[in-house]
């Protein structure tokens, strides 16, 4: 079976084509194409602008994916799209494209939960069996474990997502959004040496990032670092934190919180595996810190590279095809988007 997946819940538009061989052998990625809407430094991406980007690129990416996969429309069994969670306008633009292709090609639709897509793609690529999942991105921060055909949320952010915290601080510093603000924060943090004290907020298996963001924004303003970088920054005063120091401190603090709640979930469910998914999961420092914790517990950490960590269409095709093979379909009249589509709302029929 072959599925085409369309992802557009935020600023990345992805089209992926996945093959599940009839003999039950390992699924194959036939195409995985992505195009990103990049806003100017110091600015986020507005839903209307992002949706306009997706509408203008989706047909081009679908055609390119079909060429790369070397298949025709006749070979496609179903069209999978992100039903939620995500930003309303971008989600809607991709859902409209999926409906159009469904009607044009006469193919059935499968609405996919974005978070479940990340989990299933991570499981496929890494070969992890039943891990505790840390899902970290610009819009979500959740600690998840599978039980009784649901991906249960054991802990999550109480306010903003960790990726949103990092992205918004990048705006404060006027760091470039190309290729991604979080990536540029990570590169700057590697140069940091001074650890600045920041709030640390963990409640059980939940955490909060808004207070940390407010605190570090205030520090950046007090040291004159909130704006475009000046040539004289960091010169002459070794006691004054630099941009790199602030990025380093922010990463160390928020990642320590994530490691703590993940370890607590591992102890609760008795797992020795951690799977990190979502865009922030690409961060090498997060993977390193999580690895130290897991090794101390006699466990292991699984993560993917940017092809599969960052939002992509192939994860939607993978999760959609798993659901499609169990008989799941999304009727045209129900092919709407749900911005707050919870991970544990999905009945995971394809797992025991």
Swiss-Prot record:
Component of the EKC/KEOPS complex composed of at least bud32, cgi121, gon7, kae1 and pcc1; the whole complex dimerizes. It catalyses: L-threonylcarbamoyladenylate + adenosine(37) in tRNA = N(6)-L-threonylcarbamoyladenosine(37) in tRNA + AMP + H(+). A divalent metal cation binds at residues 114, 118, 135, 311. This is tRNA N6-adenosine threonylcarbamoyltransferase. Substrate binds at residues 135-139, 167, 182, 186, 283. Keywords: Activator, Acyltransferase, Cytoplasm, Metal-binding, Nucleus, Transcription, Transcription regulation, Transferase, tRNA processing. GO terms for cellular component: chromatin; cytoplasm; EKC/KEOPS complex; nucleus. GO terms for molecular function: chromatin DNA binding; metal ion binding; N(6)-L-threonylcarbamoyladenine synthase activity; nucleotidase activity. GO terms for biological process: positive regulation of transcription by RNA polymerase II; telomere maintenance via recombination; tRNA threonylcarbamoyladenosine modification. It comes from Aspergillus fumigatus (strain ATCC MYA-4609 / CBS 101355 / FGSC A1100 / Af293). Its cofactor is a divalent metal cation. Its EC number is 2.3.1.234. It holds the Pfam family TsaD. Component of the EKC/KEOPS complex that is required for the formation of a threonylcarbamoyl group on adenosine at position 37 (t(6)A37) in tRNAs that read codons beginning with adenine. The complex is probably involved in the transfer of the threonylcarbamoyl moiety of threonylcarbamoyl-AMP (TC-AMP) to the N6 group of A37. Kae1 likely plays a direct catalytic role in this reaction, but requires other protein(s) of the complex to fulfill this activity. The EKC/KEOPS complex also promotes both telomere uncapping and telomere elongation. Binds 1 divalent metal cation per subunit. It is found in: Cytoplasm; Nucleus. Signal peptide: none annotated. Belongs to the KAE1 / TsaD family. It is an enzyme of class 2 (transferase).
């Amino acid at each position: 079976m072959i599925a085409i997946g369309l992802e557009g819940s935020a600023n990345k538009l992805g089209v992926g084509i996945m093959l599940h061989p009839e003999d039950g052998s390992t699924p194959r990625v036939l195409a995985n194409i992505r195009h990103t809407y990049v806003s100017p430094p110091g600015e986020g991406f507005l839903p209307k602008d992002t949706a306009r980007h997706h509408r203008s690129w989706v047909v081009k990416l679908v055609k390119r994916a079909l060429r790369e996969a070397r298949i025709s429309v006749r070979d496609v069994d179903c069209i999978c799209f992100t039903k939620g969670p995500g930003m309303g306008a971008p989600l809607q633009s991709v859902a409209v494209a999926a409906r159009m292709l469904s009607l044009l090609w006469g193919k059935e639709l499968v609405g996919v939960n974005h978070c479940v897509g990340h989990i299933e793609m991570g499981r496929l690529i890494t070969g992890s069996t039943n891990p505790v999942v840390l899902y970290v991105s610009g819009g979500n921060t959740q600690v998840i474990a599978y039980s009784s055909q649901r991906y249960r949320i054991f802990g999550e952010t109480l306010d903003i997502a960790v990726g949103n915290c990092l992205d918004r601080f990048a705006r404060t510093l006027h760091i470039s959004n190309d290729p991604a603000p979080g990536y540029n924060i990570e590169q700057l943090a590697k140069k940091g040496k001074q650890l600045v004290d920041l709030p640390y907020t963990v409640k059980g298996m939940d955490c909060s990032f808004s207070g940390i963001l407010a605190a570090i924004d205030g520090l950046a303003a007090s040291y004159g670092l909130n704006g475009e970088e000046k040539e004289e920054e960091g010169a002459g005063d070794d006691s004054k934190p630099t941009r790199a120091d602030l990025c380093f401190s922010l990463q160390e603090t928020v990642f320590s919180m994530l490691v703590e709640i993940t370890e607590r979930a591992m102890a609760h469910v008795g797992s020795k595996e951690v799977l990190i998914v979502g865009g922030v999961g690409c961060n090498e420092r997060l993977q390193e810190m999580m690895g130290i914790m897991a090794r101390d517990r006699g466990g292991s950490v699984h993560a993917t590279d940017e092809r599969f960590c960052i939002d992509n269409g192939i994860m939607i095709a993978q999760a959609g095809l798993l659901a499609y093979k169990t008989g799941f379909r999304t009727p045209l009249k129900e092919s709407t988007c749900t911005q707050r589509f919870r991970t544990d709302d999905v009945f995971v029929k394809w797992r025991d």
